[in-house]
């Protein structure tokens, strides 16, 4: 038991001793740490003081440096300002001197002006005096004298001017005619169409003459109903087994012709049946119109047209101009324009498109007011055609200036198609009037003895006085006559003016 107590006391004493020793060690360490901290603080304070001193020194140096730089810049600015002030003073002095010089010049100019005015008045007075003396001596006014001088100069130099004009024209025509002939010949020889002339009547063959009476009907009711529905004249005469449909509108005439053929084939002819067959014939013709328009685009290779434009193209199949079928004419113009464009190296597709559509307005010109070119341009504008194509339509009859080479080509192709022999027919009365007018224009010129229109009005031969007109002036006269014909006369194609100067000398041997 005692052993346990002593052991416990030993442990307790050991613990107390350990505690005391540990406490002393800790206190000793704390004292050392405190001293170290004091040393660190002192070192830090010393270092901070040194840094502060260094910073102050550096700041002072920087401030001094900035002050020196500012002072230097200030001096430079002052020097620059002083220099500018000196320049300004010098410039003001120069301006002042210039003002003085200008004042002197103005005074001098004013004196000169006054002197010139006085001289002008003196000259006018002298001119008036001389004019009065001239009028007294010559007996004519200055205006008359001026006219005499101008007339003398005109007569003197007219020959020289005409000679130079003739030389220039000859050189130009020699080259341009060769090239133009080559282009047109190459185009024409690659396209040679055939045409059959259109007329204003259509004939329908009947199986027998009894059918004529059935077409007339009781008291003429059938023929009256037919003419009312179709808008044509049905001519029934003594010609055996044949009747004639007459109408200026080929479309109505074609529908009427098909209506009669259907009535004859059906055998039942009365007003109601006439109306039924008319509607069927009308539907057939509408189909033909669409097919004709599509065929025209296929033949020419023109694509991308609006369906309504294709339909209007088809209507041209039943439209004529001077006896020429307008659809065939449009196809021909498109193909010729394409060939010429190919020869000249311009846009073939545009030329073909413009050529095919150039007369599209004729499909509606019976129904809408205005020229066919204006109507056609409005149609193409409505269905989205380009401005260039519209210009081709307007320019082919001169209602607009052509803006592209293709527009000029289309106009030329149109003229070629129209001028081709046999392509068109004219009314006899209009034809005769045009020939008379052509000869009158040629005879209106001075020194013309006579004039004759030949070659169906496509050439006029002018006989001149040989002692008044020489070869050079004859060339000028032909040009002047051609210009006047262009201004006063409308005609298809190209018209040739030939001036003939013939000198005959006669002597008799006895």
From Swiss-Prot:
Membrane topology: Single-pass membrane protein
Biological processes annotated in GO: mRNA catabolic process
Span of domain KH: 200-260
Keyword rRNA processing: no
Primary location: membrane
Pfam families: HD, KH_1, RNase_Y_N
E.C. number: 3.1.-.-
InterPro entries in alphabetical order: HD/PDEase_dom, HD_domain, HDIG_dom, KH_dom, KH_dom_type_1, KH_dom_type_1_sf, Ribonuclease_Y, RNase_Y_N
GO cellular component, as recorded: plasma membrane
Record GO terms (molecular function): RNA binding; RNA endonuclease activity
Alphabetical keyword list: Cell membrane, Endonuclease, Hydrolase, Membrane, Nuclease, RNA-binding, Transmembrane, Transmembrane helix
Compartment list: Cell membrane
Enzyme class per UniProt: hydrolase
TM region(s), chain numbering: 1-21
Cited function: Endoribonuclease that initiates mRNA decay.
Similarity comment: family membership: Belongs to the RNase Y family.
Record's protein name: Ribonuclease Y
């Amino acid at each position: 038991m005692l052993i346990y107590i002593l052991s416990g006391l030993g442990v307790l004493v050991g613990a107390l001793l350990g505690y005391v020793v540990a406490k002393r060690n800790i206190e000793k360490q704390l004292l050392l740490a405190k001293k170290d901290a004091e040393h660190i603080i002192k070192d830090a304070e010393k270092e901070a003081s040194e840094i502060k001193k260094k910073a102050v020194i550096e700041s002072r140096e920087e401030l001094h440096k900035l002050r020196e730089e500012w002072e230097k810049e200030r001096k430079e600015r002052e020097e620059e300002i002083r220099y500018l002030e000196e320049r300004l003073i010098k410039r003001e002095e120069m301006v002042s001197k210039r003002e003085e010089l200008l004042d002197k010049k103005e005074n001098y100019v004013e004196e000169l002006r006054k002197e010139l005015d006085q001289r002008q008045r003196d000259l006018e007075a002298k001119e008036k005096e001389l004019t009065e003396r001239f009028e007294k001596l010559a007996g004519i006014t200055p205006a008359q004298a001026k006219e005499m001088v101008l007339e003398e100069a005109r007569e003197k130099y007219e020959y020289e001017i005409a000679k130079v004009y003739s030389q220039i024209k000859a050189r130009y025509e020699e080259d341009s005619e060769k090239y133009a002939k080559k282009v047109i010949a190459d185009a024409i020889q690659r396209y040679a169409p055939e045409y059959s002339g259109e007329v204003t009547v259509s004939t329908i063959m009947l199986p027998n003459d009894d059918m004529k009476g059935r077409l007339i009907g009781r008291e003429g009711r059938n023929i009256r109903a037919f003419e009312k529905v179709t808008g044509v004249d049905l001519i029934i005469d003594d010609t055996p087994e044949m009747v004639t449909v007459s109408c200026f509108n080929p479309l109505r005439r074609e529908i009427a012709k098909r209506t009669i053929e259907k009535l004859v084939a059906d055998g039942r002819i009365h007003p109601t049946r006439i109306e039924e067959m008319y509607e069927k014939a009308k539907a057939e013709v509408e189909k033909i119109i669409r097919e004709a328009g599509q065929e025209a685009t296929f033949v020419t290779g023109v694509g991308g047209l609006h369906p309504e434009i294709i339909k209007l193209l088809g209507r041209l199949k039943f439209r004529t101009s001077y006896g020429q079928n307008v659809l065939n004419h449009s196809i021909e113009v498109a193909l010729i324009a394409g060939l010429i464009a190919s020869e000249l190296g311009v846009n073939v597709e545009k030329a073909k498109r413009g050529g095919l559509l150039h007369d599209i307005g004729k499909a509606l010109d019976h129904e809408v007011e205005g020229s066919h070119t204006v109507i056609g341009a409005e149609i193409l504008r409505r269905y989205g055609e380009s401005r260039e194509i519209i210009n081709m339509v307007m320019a082919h009859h001169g209602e607009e200036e052509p803006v592209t080479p293709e527009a000029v080509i289309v106009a030329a192709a149109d003229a070629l198609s129209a001028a081709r022999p046999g392509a068109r027919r004219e009314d006899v009365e209009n034809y005769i009037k045009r020939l008379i007018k052509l000869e009158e224009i040629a005879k209106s010129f001075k020194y013309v003895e006579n004039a004759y229109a030949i070659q169906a009005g496509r050439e006029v031969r002018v006989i001149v006085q040989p002692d008044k007109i020489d070869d050079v002036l004859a060339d000028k006269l032909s040009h002047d006559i051609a210009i006047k014909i262009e201004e006063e006369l409308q005609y298809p194609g190209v018209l040739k003016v030939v001036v003939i100067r013939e000198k005959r000398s006669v002597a008799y041997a006895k």
